[in-house]
Amino acid sequence: MSQLVECVPNFSEGKNQEVIDAISGAITQTPGCVLLDVDAGPSTNRTVYTFVGPPECVVEGALNAARVASRLIDMSRHQGEHPRMGALDVCPFIPVRGVSVDECVLCAQAFGQRLAEELDVPVYLYGEAARMDSRRTLPAIRAGEYEALPKKLQQADWAPDFGPSSFVPSWGATATGARKFLIAFNINLLGTKEQAHRIALNLREQGRGKDQPGRLKKVQGIGWYLDEKNLAQVSTNLLDFEVTALHTVYEETCREAQELSLPVVGSQLVGLVPLKALLDAAAFYCEKENLFILEEEQRIRLVVSRLGLDSLCPFSPKERIIEYLVPERGPERGLGSKSLRAFVGEVGARSAAPGGGSVAAAAAAMGAALGSMVGLMTYGRRQFQSLDTTMRRLIPPFREASAKLTTLVDADAEAFTAYLEAMRLPKNTPEEKDRRTAALQEGLRRAVSVPLTLAETVASLWPALQELARCGNLACRSDLQVAAKALEMGVFGAYFNVLINLRDITDEAFKDQIHHRVSSLLQEAKTQAALVLDCLETRQE
């Protein structure tokens, strides 16, 4: 799964459409960047852009946009209702998929340093990227706004993190940083504004003040009345949905409303939402209601129903979930997303990757998928009704393993490519030689870890496959037989890929440990596959 970072730069121009479009163009023309939204405000004279992409791409996209802004925006003439201090006022980086906040901090640091060096402007780090507590919040950095910068920059306490401590009239200053994804989530009530606000005060982290904190961490909240819909809302901002989830806010609001004898009539998501936030809610309701729902589309539909996300307007996942708006990979990348014909063609081409490691991962992924298939061919049928509970338990591990193993098809090829890149590093000086040696050793360890992960993943499936062989739909006997051999073959391939990469690793203790482990996994695969085949051969109709 590719990494995805959201970038939300705020530029101090909301009236001149040519400038707004030029900045949009700079972002969309950056390879790897997908522009999701452009929100221009004439009264604030400010435009908020939302775009996503891999970490290195969004940094380039933000820089390209800033270059255009430096030519077209003159802060000495800027007027607007929104607080501001620079042509590019603020530029946060936000993790969406496969990226940590710490990695987004690195994005902010790289962007801030390059922006300051190229445009010779002052840049401050805020949020999770802040280097001192006094700069964690944007209002603290922006205090006094653009007009205060000439004197502020002369103070030692306000020396920028990057760039000169001098006033640049046409630009001002920029703040960049990292934060978690913010979700705006409103719950609908048939009640009054005051009742909604009472609930918000009980729930939001701030509560009613220091002496009366609320129950939900990382949640802001207020109550208001939506005249056009003739209902009240508990309006919340989830500052970290992994600390307090969507379903937690909804369920707690329902509990508060019940105590006030108020009906909750659905909810509303404002803006875009990460897929994980909805899948976490789906997992909660599946467990709470003992539901067996495997497909992502159906799990999203469940959440839309349980939270009433379509109560005020249609909720289209394809238009509201960030990951659905962004292609997983470019057309030239992603073995796992290619057709079978294209994948086989690449394997057969005159290149070292994809090779045996990717083929082993693909075989194991298909073996796990066959296990899932047999489980589903058993589940929900009247003649196997007594096995429904068992199948509910057995099917998910196969589906999860199949998805994980599919990612290893690409991971193996990428590990090999990274090793080749290390091979090409210069080795003219002692320092370069040391750097190259370290990179080669790291590349070899990565090349070992991928097939080892494959073998470990398959090992976790043998108990489930044994049980499926004993009680699964016998009409699928041959499918389970193929599954057993495909999984064994995957481990077989992993074993030899580990060995060939261990050969040049210099850490002997590491080599011995990994060799012993992968040998054990191969022997286990041979034994377990044979047991599955024997069980299937002896089973009677």
Swiss-Prot record:
GO terms for cellular component: centriole; cytoplasm; cytosol; endoplasmic reticulum; endoplasmic reticulum-Golgi intermediate compartment; extracellular exosome; Golgi apparatus; Golgi membrane. Residues 335-541 are annotated as: Cyclodeaminase/cyclohydrolase. The active site is at 82 (for formimidoyltransferase activity), 412 (for cyclodeaminase activity). Residues 327-334 are annotated as: Linker. GO terms for molecular function: folic acid binding; formimidoyltetrahydrofolate cyclodeaminase activity; glutamate formimidoyltransferase activity; microtubule binding. The modification Phosphoserine is found at residues 316, 386, 520. Keywords: Cytoplasm, Cytoskeleton, Disease variant, Folate-binding, Golgi apparatus, Histidine metabolism, Lyase, Multifunctional enzyme, Phosphoprotein, Transferase. One of its GO terms (biological process) is L-histidine catabolic process to glutamate and formamide. Pathway: Amino-acid degradation; L-histidine degradation into L-glutamate; L-glutamate from N-formimidoyl-L-glutamate (transferase route): step 1/1. Its EC number is 2.1.2.5, 4.3.1.4. It is found in: Cytoplasm, Cytosol; Golgi apparatus; Cytoplasm, Cytoskeleton, Microtubule organizing center, Centrosome, Centriole. Residues 182-326 are annotated as: Formiminotransferase C-subdomain. It comes from the Eukaryota. Residues 1-181 are annotated as: Formiminotransferase N-subdomain. It catalyses: 5-formimidoyltetrahydrofolate + L-glutamate = N-formimidoyl-L-glutamate + (6S)-5,6,7,8-tetrahydrofolate; 5-formimidoyltetrahydrofolate + 2 H(+) = (6R)-5,10-methenyltetrahydrofolate + NH4(+). In the C-terminal section; belongs to the cyclodeaminase/cyclohydrolase family. It is linked to Glutamate formiminotransferase deficiency: Autosomal recessive disorder. Features of a severe phenotype, include elevated levels of formiminoglutamate (FIGLU) in the urine in response to histidine administration, megaloblastic anemia, and intellectual disability. Features of a mild phenotype include high urinary excretion of FIGLU in the absence of histidine administration, mild developmental delay, and no hematological abnormalities. Homooctamer, including four polyglutamate binding sites. The subunits are arranged as a tetramer of dimers, and form a planar ring-shaped structure. Folate-dependent enzyme, that displays both transferase and deaminase activity. Serves to channel one-carbon units from formiminoglutamate to the folate pool. Binds and promotes bundling of vimentin filaments originating from the Golgi. This is Formimidoyltransferase-cyclodeaminase. The lineage of its organism: Eukaryota, Metazoa, Chordata, Craniata, Vertebrata. The gene is FTCD.
